[in-house]
From Swiss-Prot:
Regions of this protein lying in the Cytoplasmic compartment: 1-58, 159-372
Function, as annotated: Inward rectifier potassium channels are characterized by a greater tendency to allow potassium to flow into the cell rather than out of it. Their voltage dependence is regulated by the concentration of extracellular potassium; as external potassium is raised, the voltage range of the channel opening shifts to more positive voltages. The inward rectification is mainly due to the blockage of outward current by internal magnesium. This channel is activated by internal ATP and can be blocked by external barium. In the kidney, probably plays a major role in potassium homeostasis.
Gene Ontology terms, MF aspect: ATP binding; inward rectifier potassium channel activity; phosphatidylinositol-4,5-bisphosphate binding
Positions with a binding annotation for ATP: 204-211
Record text on activity regulation: Inhibited by WNK3. Activated by phosphatidylinositol 4,5 biphosphate (PtdIns(4,5)P2).
Membrane-spanning segments: 59-83, 137-158
Residues annotated with Phosphoserine modification: 25
Keywords: ATP-binding, Cell membrane, Glycoprotein, Ion channel, Ion transport, Membrane, Nucleotide-binding, Phosphoprotein, Potassium, Potassium transport, Transmembrane, Transmembrane helix, Transport, Voltage-gated channel
Cellular component GO terms held in the UniProt record: monoatomic ion channel complex; plasma membrane
Glycan-modified residues: 98
Extracellular side: 84-108, 128-136
Assembly mode: Interacts with SGK1 and SLC9A3R2/NHERF2.
Organism field: Mus musculus
The protein's name in its UniProt record: ATP-sensitive inward rectifier potassium channel 1
């Protein structure tokens, strides 16, 4: 009980006073800001206009969508008004009744805007139409029709592409809020639970991690966000996961693990961020998606394990209880990985009949000594 109170006190009192900076948020967004980018580098974003439009937020995308259509309608409406003005088809020029205008029934800027709208959207009410009197009007009609198709294709395609991006599929992949450290298969492991909320599978799923921390090289150079590979496995391996039910992935804390020299008492004092990646191909669209999350030391629970959430019903179906998805229970766990391996070495030496590996008993033939 006192252990729970101490962990709650440290998390809610001291955790609020010193918020750790995260590179990746819990929902996978990258917390990074680019500064002092020159104008030439910013121009590259306009060269790759398709990716720039796709990456825009919805409010900016809809603003661009509405502005593109209204702007093109107004611009061509102004051009149609200029054509009528130059050809003196407007009522203020008092054209004769037997004169054929470039565009019938354009009486001002409002009617020119309506004709531009009807032309580009292909409404075609029939009251305003182009005659064969002006080659300029015919060319402008062709140009607006082609440009209207391009704008429609680009803007509608951008919205459809943003809706169908696999990024939205990644929202249905969830990770446990906390990672736990406990024994599994006689080894000390760091465990994380991940679940697929859809019945459609991720094909060729691969999971891995990166440990980010500040390190100092022997030459005295400080490397911020130094990355160390963290290998995660499940009981069937880490390639081509059968992601039909929630999985508990684990990282074995051995001599090659960066967690090997950490202990339960010093874990909260560490300064690192564990970023976990899950790559896979969406079964329904064949698009590749990536899911990310991160864990800081306060979110790693030493001496806990996840409670079971998969059970079998009377009808023979397997039921997943997501109410207990992130719940943990306390279990007996060594307070450091080094202690566990030292204990195993001590037991192995005891089985061989000696405690000190440098001291080995050897038999002496006493008959040879007496004969001498």
């Amino acid at each position: 009980m006192f252990k729970h109170l101490r962990r709650w006190f440290v998390t809610h009192i001291f955790g609020r006073s010193r918020q750790r900076a995260r590179l990746v948020s819990k929902d996978g967004r990258c917390n990074i800001e680019f500064g002092n980018v020159d104008a030439q580098s910013r121009f590259i974003f306009f060269v790759d206009i398709w990716t720039t439009v796709l990456d825009l937020k919805w409010r900016y995308k809809m603003t661009v969508f509405i502005t593109a259509f209204l702007g093109s309608w107004f611009l061509f409406g102004l051009l149609w008004y200029v054509v009528a003005y130059v050809h003196k088809d407007l009522p203020e020029f008092y054209p004769p009744d037997n004169r054929t205008p470039c565009v019938e029934n354009i009486n001002g800027m409002t009617s020119a805007f309506l004709f531009s709208l009807e032309t580009q959207v292909t409404i075609g009410y029939g009251f305003r139409f182009v005659t064969e009197q002006c080659a300029t009007a015919i060319f402008l009609l062709i140009f607006q029709s082609i440009l209207g198709v391009i704008i429609n294709s680009f803007m509608c395609g951008a919205i459809l592409a943003k809706i169908s991006r696999p990024k939205k599929r990644a929202k249905t992949i969830t990770f446990s809020k906390n990672a736990v450290i406990s024994k599994r298969g006689g080894k000390l492991c760091l465990l994380i639970r991940v679940a697929n909320l859809r019945k459609s599978l991720l094909i060729g799923s691969h999971i891995y991690g990166k440990l980010l921390k500040t390190t100092i090289t022997p030459e005295g150079e400080t490397i911020i966000l130094d990355q160390t590979n963290i290998n995660f496995v499940v009981d069937a391996g880490n390639e081509n996961l059968f992601f039909i039910s929630p999985l508990t992935i684990y990282h074995i804390i051995d001599h090659n693990s960066p967690f090997f020299h950490m202990a339960a008492e010093t874990l909260s004092q560490q300064d690192f961020e564990l970023v976990v990646f899950l790559d896979g191909t969406v079964e329904s669209t064949s698009a590749t998606c990536q899911v990310r999350t991160s864990y800081i030391p306060e979110e790693v629970l030493w001496g806990y394990r996840f409670v079971p959430i998969v059970s079998k019903t009377k009808e023979g179906k397997y039921r997943v209880d997501f109410h207990n998805f992130g719940k943990t229970v306390e279990v007996e766990t060594p307070h450091c990985a080094m202690c566990l391996y030292n204990e195993k070495d001590a037991r192995a030496r005891m089985k061989r009949g000696y405690d000190n590996p440098n001291f080995v008993l050897s038999e002496v033939d006493e008959t040879d000594d007496t004969q001498m």
